């Protein structure tokens, strides 16, 4: 690697963090208020939303995860990953207005769940939501640590701690409003990084065209087809756990702005992740790696080693900016979720800020001590979301599933995770391996191992089946109880909901006809 001196690297790292701190504090002083600390509903137009969704969908981890899949499953696997990562962003424009019709004063998914299924179910979903964001924060710190150490050869512990301190300080004062603005900055940085790195790689990397055909990286493959299902289910459901996406969905001024923002973001995310991922097979064609190389996740940095030092320094700066903005978004989203779901936004803003500081301690410890496999961290969160989210979303269709209650949803989600364990135990003939499957211990990229595929089938399908079975059993028990006691049977009564309209939106069910919805001013 064409590295700078340790003094030069340290200067770049800590001056970059100082710049981000100064920028964040200035934005907090200029734009923040207690009103916007947790959310900014109905304030944002399409283009700022697009930049925010792009930034929320990315972190430094994209540099390694997409290159790794490209090195293993070639163009087929890479396109599957990037398409599956982009399409769910548009899903917020589809589902977001429906959620807002039902819960116009909320700003995250769990608030609608509280209205539909009750407090206990909302806390259940909130716990898994916070767990997901916790894992993503650990993954992001692990990713920036790996990036800094690879680019500089330095121990990145100090940089990781400084990043946490920097984002905590300006998020402490600015909250969601500052996070939203820094995400716009991050979106621009990602585009600049892409343009400069693409130009650099085009100038300094030599491709041996004789290796392209024999590598087989441009052909369809079994793993690529397996990932079509696995990654789509994993990413669609996991995005629903990311409160940062919901905060931005509710921040849209109109549904049209939401459609514009998510559509642009989906396309840009697809393009950026695809181009970054191509380093996985470019490194093979340049002779630096082999197909399925154990260092495939480092393909971007391996190619970067062929470039001049100024370009390495540039990439280091933008990795820091990218990670800092991603991390502050996760911080803001987690604090907003806890404040809303646990304390009902009644906690004094200073206590919310203290909570922001406290959650950093375990995250830093885990990121430094135990988080080595970034992709596996994400996959654990993906499997949990695949088990829980489908049964929750049945509650959007009141015409068909009005009889579902919170108990059914919780039984479905937890039962699905138990089902994955049972499947793994049977498939691998070992309870130990069944437990490992819950953690996706063996990864996704072994096409001969159908365990992960089965897990991502059992999780959503099993969750829905168990939810419906739980509802049927509960209704049957209540019916028998009403017959025995003579009490009124109400288990199949449709819940009465108040339809509310906010701004130019109509709020109701996913299957409501607009002509039947009453406008309330």
Curated annotation (Swiss-Prot):
Transport recorded as keyword: yes
Keywords assigned by UniProt, alphabetized: Glycoprotein, Membrane, Transmembrane, Transmembrane helix, Transport
Cellular localisation: Membrane
InterPro entries, per database record: Na/Glc_symporter_sf (IPR038377), Na/solute_symporter (IPR001734), Sodium:Solute_Symporter (IPR050277)
Phenotype caused by lack of the gene: Decreases spermidine uptake. Does not affect significantly salivary gland-secreted histatin 5 (Hst 5) mediated killing.
Catalytic activity of the protein: spermidine(in) = spermidine(out)
Disulfide bonds: none
Major localization class: membrane
UniProt-listed GO biological process terms: cellular response to metal ion; cellular response to starvation; filamentous growth; filamentous growth of a population of unicellular organisms; filamentous growth of a population of unicellular organisms in response to biotic stimulus; filamentous growth of a population of unicellular organisms in response to starvation; intracellular pH elevation; spermidine transport
Domain of life from the UniProt record: Eukaryota
Topology term for the membrane: Multi-pass membrane protein
Record Gene3D superfamilies: Sodium/glucose cotransporter
One Pfam family this sequence matches: SSF
Segments crossing the lipid bilayer: 11-31, 47-67, 79-99, 117-137, 156-176, 187-207, 227-247, 264-284, 310-330, 354-374, 377-397, 406-426, 453-473
GO cellular component labels: plasma membrane
Entry's Gene Ontology molecular function annotations: spermidine transmembrane transporter activity
Glycosylated residues, chain numbering: 41
Similarity-based family: Belongs to the sodium:solute symporter (SSF) (TC 2.A.21) family.
The protein's role, per its UniProt record: Spermidine transporter that is also used by salivary gland-secreted histatin 5 (Hst 5) to enter into candidal cells. A major component of host nonimmune defense systems is salivary histatins, a family of small (3-4 kDa), histidine-rich, cationic proteins secreted by major salivary glands in humans and higher primates. Hst 5 is the most potent of the 12 histatin family members and has fungicidal activity against blastoconidial and filamentous forms of Candida albicans. DUR31 only functions under high concentrations of Hst 5. Hst 5 cojugates to spermidine to be uptaken by DUR31.
Protein name: Spermidine transporter DUR31
Species: Candida albicans (strain SC5314 / ATCC MYA-2876) (Yeast)
